Amino acid sequence: MNKKITYLVLGCVLGAGATYAACGLLGKQASLTDTSNSAVNSAPKQLTYADIIIPPEGDYGQPVRTLIQDHTKIYNQFVSDVQTAAVNTPVSKIDPYGLAPLAALVGIHTDQPTQAEVIILGGPGEPVRRYKPTEVTQTHILPVLGLKADTANRVQIVIHSKEGTPQGSYNLTLQTNPLAVSTPKPEVIKAKEENFHHKLYFVSPSEGEGMGKQSPHTIGLDEKGTIRWAFNPEMGATPLMKPWKDGKWLAFMPNKLAGKRGGASKYLMAFDLTGRVHNIWKAEHRLHHDFAILKDGRVSIATDGPQPFKIEDVAITATLTDKPNLQVDETLHMESVLKRRPLILDTQAGYLPSYDWFHMNGIDENPNGTYRVYSGRNQSATVAVNNDKSLRWILADPAGWPKSMAPYLLKPKGKDNSVDFEWSWGQHSPVFRDANHLFLFDNGNFRSTQFATATPAHDNYSRLVEYKINDDNTIEQVWSFGKERGHKLYAPYVGGVDYIAETDSVVGVFGGIVRNRLGNPSDIVAGTFKNAAHVIEVSHTTPPEVLTELVFENTDIHTDRGYMIYRGTVCDVYCAYTK
């Protein structure tokens, strides 16, 4: 029997130091007919800006920059221990900084200048991970990454001559502890049995009820779903981390690590996978959702501007120096380049029209370095802006845009909204494959700007989609995955996509799948729902072949607790050392 069910789309505020979104609702409602058994919820109260503004930062339990000093002391002490040990005697320390329980340092001081290599020996059918710096020295300090929890891990140090000839090896056993009981472990739907690669899926599954208080964890999963890296959950989690250079990664700093009592983070940190924090930079305004590492070494970060009643419509370009504050070189206000259209499904949809009109959730730089793209969820638009801050193009359904934006709207080759081409809706995670091909995570929210033609959840879907953008401002859809799964993968509020050139494959994080307790599909309904997340790697072929599928889900019908994943990064544990 058909029922009327109230659909209220949330405007989500994802803080840099949080792994969940705090979402506000507006009071007006509209209805769609839904044939699922989703529960009907009462209308929420009318919320004001005070309800959705980011909470105050609170007090700091420890000045964040002392963390760098503490970690430097730990590292220097380990170097000293290696140098004072007997010559050619390995020294090891698991989780040296208390932040990465599946990582270690090993060191050895040789009697003459040599090269050293560390090899992590896997079990049957598992890849062997190895790292060999080019440095010739007597004191070797090597990161050991990709260990298993609660396991006697076999590690080998191989010494090479200055010319690279193996001279001898040392075998070590590193016994790791079990991970925290609360650490989420995926159900493995499909996993590789052979032809393994070294990459891990770095994700932050958060357990909780809807968008309420979450219990986040940041972990790295191999292609069998085994956890091979983890961040200490007592220090929080980061929703996003990306490999940078010299072994370092960049990440939004977890709130607990910063010593904060709540609120969203203003900190970007550089760390390595052994857990050492190398640098921390503070921004003037809140950091959120995404950052891109640019070809010139700078970073572009989604942030808030100084306006008191606008959020998530600004990007800064910053140089990372040895000073404690971000050196901001450029600021882009989206309102200066883009004339907005009425928000998706009009203002009744609860998108906080005065505050969160754009909702920037993704940034990437074109491989040529001439322009950047910015994903605006609440405009269902991916916007390209040239380096001189002029508008280049808009990837969006053409309905509702001001006339001045018409010349910039990409025009599809192939029939609009057909089997050959579909627009993206509420999208996340723009990723360039090359200068002309762009991936998006197409969340699919309603697939319309009007309720009369909106797609209800039980008929909807989310996709990984690849577009080709031509120089004449035409656009083609050249590849996709997800529509064939229907509502089973419908994730209306978060998600991500990444292209893996090494294997010509695509990884999708369907991280915000929304259902009710009984497992029926739902949009974000009156603020309460149950999350599930799928991490899926597929071949970049037509049709795509599923290579790996890992699921985080709570099927207990007596609880609303589930799992969400904001986004993911796919990389070998040693990839930052080769950048």
Segments the model singles out, each with a brief description of its role:
Residues 41-116, 120, 137-141, 145-152, ...:
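Histidine-/acidic-rich catalytic cores in large beta-rich domains
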Residues 19-35:
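Sec-dependent signal peptide cleavage junction
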Residues 10, 25-26, 114:
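Short intrinsically disordered, low-complexity segments
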